């Protein structure tokens, strides 16, 4: 068996890193349909899930920056269409998808139709701000085009009754969902214009899925709204729901209730004007951002290939794993420390601090007495030793020797004379006795 003389040897981490780069660079973006399962949404804001079909499954991650743009709440068991890129979670060697966008299955075809019609109508100028009609500051009559049994109608009527109970209201009932809904909505708008009973119209309905709201994305509705001589406020679904009707209408309200607030008179008329301008500005920004989204997406993919955010996302996913392990470890430590505290508390309760204080006081008193006794004994001993030293000193003192009859003789220079060899005839010497001195001259 022959072996390569120079085999390329990998570490596990290096191998996983190169496999990740291979997947991300070679495969690029993929579109995938599957069923959501094992969905988790940790505090980091990222989503982790599994997409599966009847024969296979794949792990997926959708980071916070992307999932905040999802317009619905994903649930286990729900079919979704995702745009993703292949990757590898290096710490575990798990092959996974990094999801960049997500929508409910079936929304993809409708979204394409939506984008195509929106671009077509925008090119014709139907969305232009110059085509918008100003809303009357004090409407004399409000027309409502919606379902006569829907919750949206009752929400609008309740708000109008609360804010301006004397404002006349005319209802033009119509279907707001289904095959014939778009035609009926267009006919209701035409009927309101031909009767010319109102000076403002609210067109809308409550929230729903993309399919539920689709009649407001039909071209016939958009063109009828654009052709209306009466200013129209669109109020379709919730704030996150955006339809073609919203772009064509003179003003978009986020909800039916908000539309009623917008068209009804209020004592604070100046605040109403400011609020209206804010809504128009937001609508213009939304249109602009929507028009630029496709243009940005091409550049976004190129940038993201080398963007540090990719590494940050991987590290963030790893951090989620470490956070989970840390939480488990902290919980175990807390339990052990709690057990120790309970044991220490029990031991502490069996010890009396007062008893220990009393014992320490007694010990201090004993040590104090012993210290004083030791000081007294030491002082007495030092005095005795001092007396003995004084006696010894007195014994060797020259004065004591002189008292016994001895004398001390010195020459003229003061040097001590201890021998006759040290004096000569004629020298002057000084002799000291115990009671004084005598000077003498040496004769011989």
Swiss-Prot record:
The keyword Acetylation does not apply. Its EC number is 3.1.11.6. InterPro entries: Exonuc_VII_L (IPR003753), Exonuc_VII_lsu_C (IPR020579), OB-fold_nuc-bd_dom (IPR025824). Its main location: cytoplasm. Keywords: Cytoplasm, Exonuclease, Hydrolase, Nuclease. It catalyses: Exonucleolytic cleavage in either 5'- to 3'- or 3'- to 5'-direction to yield nucleoside 5'-phosphates. GO terms for molecular function: exodeoxyribonuclease VII activity; nucleic acid binding. It is found in: Cytoplasm. Pfam families: Exonuc_VII_L, tRNA_anti_2. GO terms for cellular component: cytoplasm; exodeoxyribonuclease VII complex. GO terms for biological process: DNA catabolic process. Bidirectionally degrades single-stranded DNA into large acid-insoluble oligonucleotides, which are then degraded further into small acid-soluble oligonucleotides. This is Exodeoxyribonuclease 7 large subunit. It comes from Aliivibrio salmonicida (strain LFI1238) (Vibrio salmonicida (strain LFI1238)). The gene is xseA.
